[in-house]
Every structure is written in structure tokens, then in C-alpha cells.
Amino acid sequence: MAGPAPGRRLVALALIVALAVGLPTAGAGQAPRPAERGPPVRLFTEEELARYGGEEEDQPIYMAVKGVVFDVTSGKEFYGRGAPYNALTGKDSTRGVAKMSLDPADLTHDTTGLTAEELESLDDVFTRVYKAKYPIVGYTARRILNEDGSPNLDFKPEDQPHFDIKDEF
């Protein structure tokens, strides 16, 4: 089986470099410093999150990874309108982050079929980039509620930003 196309590898490499830019440095064995706290968290439907895709100059830029909504406005040069990773914003892009992919088919919350390596990459980027660098502003409704509107029993209150987040899925 052939490896990924050279163009796709270049996009993945560029994504890794872009995500690593500005990472806080931590000593050996130290966890990255959590991002500064922002406004209180809220619940976002897919439609509400789509309003924060970087298209409006006066709006913050939000994206979700693993159902956690981050304010990535401080990375506007990467996530703003016309920026290289704008495709990740305004939605839960968990699969795209795991696969280091900007393919529209990968810009979804669905992690079905991801390899162990992709899941490990997802956890690493989630912790070392997003949780360390960007404020949590909310959660996707899909993470808190089931399709029928009933509570998602897998959601844990300790996932709230004022607690130390220890277990993400």
C-alpha cells in the first residue's frame, strides 16, 4: 500500500510545525502550563459553533477538539479568514487533528476507525497545544447531550475548566 501523497505529507508537516509554534516550554517531566482562563464556558450546537469560523473580523475564532471548544483567536495568523488552518475552525475538527488532515471529509468529531497512532497523536496535540495554549470557552452539545437530548453519561463534571482535566474520553 502506498504512503500518503507528497502534497498531503507536506500539509501534515506544515500543520505540525504551525501547531508547535509558540508552545510554552516545560521542564522535563513537567506538564504544559494551562491557558489563561477566559469567560465562563457554555454549550455550543454545531450551528452556533459555525458562527465562530473566523469569517467575521469582530468575532472570536473558535474550534473544537474532542468536544472541547477552544478560543484560538490568539492564533489568528493560523486560524483566521484565509489562513492555512481556517478549515479547522467553526466546528469540531477532532478527526482532522488526529490525522493531521485538512481534507473536508476529516473535519468532523467522528473518531471511528482511527489508528492507535492517530489517537495518540490526537491526545498529544490536544494536551500540548490546545489545552496548553488556548482558553476553553465551552463544549459541543454532542459531548454533553445524546442525539435524543438526554444527558451523555460519559461527560464528567471534572472536565470543566476550573478542575484539572484528567480524563478526556
Curated annotation (Swiss-Prot):
Belongs to the cytochrome b5 family. MAPR subfamily. It is found in: Secreted, Extracellular space; Mitochondrion; Endoplasmic reticulum. This is Neudesin. It comes from Bos taurus (Bovine). GO terms for biological process: MAPK cascade; negative regulation of appetite; positive regulation of MAPK cascade. Keywords: Acetylation, Endoplasmic reticulum, Heme, Iron, Metal-binding, Mitochondrion, Secreted, Signal. GO terms for molecular function: growth factor activity; metal ion binding. Acts as a neurotrophic factor in postnatal mature neurons enhancing neuronal survival. Promotes cell proliferation and neurogenesis in undifferentiated neural progenitor cells at the embryonic stage and inhibits differentiation of astrocytes. Its neurotrophic activity is exerted via MAPK1/ERK2, MAPK3/ERK1 and AKT1/AKT pathways. Neurotrophic activity is enhanced by binding to heme. Also acts as an anorexigenic neurotrophic factor that contributes to energy balance. Its main location: secreted. Residues 41-126 form the Cytochrome b5 heme-binding domain. The keyword Acetylation applies. GO terms for cellular component: endomembrane system; endoplasmic reticulum; extracellular space; membrane; mitochondrion.
